[in-house]
């Protein structure tokens, strides 16, 4: 907890949870814990955001307030003046879409609404301002460790007993926060391996260094594509 928290500059007002079920389970866990008004807004920029949007429809009114599906998710829509629902409990995004090669360069203007973000494919790849998010989560298999676990960073005031009726105990953020992510037998191997990566990240110089290294690696590919006559 301490290593990932220090690398991400997570303040005491957030909890770091090590949860099972992968990132896909969060598609249900988020509305179960947050959809108090039974309304949430989704920006659909790829298949993962689309799956989250479809899952949320089970629990309440999920509004698709922006999408790039008209051009096969090949761009991020303008999110500067979104039609945010007045009674929305949160606005949901998938921040990086590896299938389509798109990433938010600027977080959407949620007009004061809680921002929930799936950062699975860019987790711990660059510094972030955690205070811009209510919940930020990522499946560890992309950047951090073996498949089978998700790390969720949840603002403390969102961790309550006020969840949707019928929410299973294992699907409540509070039960995991109150038990140090060990309400049931934790994914010990994943946590151990993630710990190794956290220590390596720190030894390498932290997230600023990771950002620089990732940009240098990406430049090799994109420079080649820019100079290629085949790819336009």
Give the location of each predicted region:
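Conserved PLP-binding catalytic core of the aspartate aminotransferase-like
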Residues: 231-232
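Conserved beta-loop-alpha segment that forms the PLP phosphate-binding cup at the N-terminus of a helix
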Residues: 14-41, 49-52
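Active-site phosphate-binding strand-loop segment of PLP-dependent enzymes
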Residues: 56, 68-123
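Conserved active-site segment immediately N-terminal to the catalytic lysine
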Residues: 116, 130-141, 150
């Amino acid at each position: 907890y301490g290593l990932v928290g220090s690398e991400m500059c997570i303040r005491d007002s957030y909890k770091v949870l090590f949860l099972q079920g992968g990132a896909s389970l969060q598609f249900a866990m988020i509305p179960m814990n947050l959809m108090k008004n039974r309304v949430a807004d989704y920006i659909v920029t790829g298949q993962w955001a689309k799956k989250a949007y479809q899952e949320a429809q089970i629990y309440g009114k999920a509004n698709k307030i922006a999408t790039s599906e008209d051009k096969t998710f090949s761009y991020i829509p303008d999110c500067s003046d979104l039609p945010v629902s007045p009674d929305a409990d949160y606005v949901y995004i998938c921040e990086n879409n590896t299938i389509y090669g798109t990433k938010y360069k600027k977080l959407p203007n949620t007009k004061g609404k809680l921002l929930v973000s799936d950062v699975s494919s860019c987790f711990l790849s660059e510094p972030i301002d955690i205070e811009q998010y209510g919940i930020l989560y990522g499946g560890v298999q992309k950047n951090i460790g073996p498949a089978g676990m998700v790390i969720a960073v949840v603002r403390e005031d969102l961790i309550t007993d006020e969840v949707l009726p019928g929410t299973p105990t294992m699907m409540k953020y509070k039960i995991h926060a109150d038990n140090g992510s060990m309400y049931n037998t934790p994914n010990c191997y994943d946590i151990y391996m993630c710990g190794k990566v956290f220590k390596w990240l720190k030894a390498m110089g932290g997230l600023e260094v990771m950002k620089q290294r990732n940009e240098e690696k990406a430049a090799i590919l994109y420079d080649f594509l820019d100079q290629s006559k085949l790819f336009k």
